[in-house]
Amino acid sequence: MSPEPDDLVLEIGTGLGYQSAVLAEVVGRVYSVEIIDELAQQAIQRLKQQGYANVEVRVGNGYSGWPEHAPFDKVIVTAAPDLIPPPLINQLKAGGRMVIPVGLPDAQQLVLAEKDLNGRIATKEIMPVLFSLLEGVDQPSFRMS
């Protein structure tokens, strides 16, 4: 993903906040969306206790991203849609990069999606993976090139 110190990063799937904390050490600001309220609340407490003031967590459906803080330099997704959600593509800054697992429950690929300066998306399959499914994916999505 090549994170930079001034990057604005969207994380989908906060979990307990470990990856959020790691990201917060190397980028400027992290916005993280977690669909499970209990996990989000635990992450908020842990991140606050550890002094991570540059991470904001909210409860919500990651499919929709966090448009109020877009565009993002980087997007990292930790649950797999069958195809890349258009809201996440739309919230990726020109020149930005997204890492996302994509596919069916038994056939997923970790994908690097890059948006060029003209807004075109190029994707590259990195490796086979197995993630939990991204909830709320019931809308048309972007097909990989």
Can you say where each PLM-predicted feature lies in the sequence?
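Conserved nucleotide-cofactor-binding alpha/beta core module
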Residues: 2-118
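Active-site capping/gating segments
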Residues: 103-145
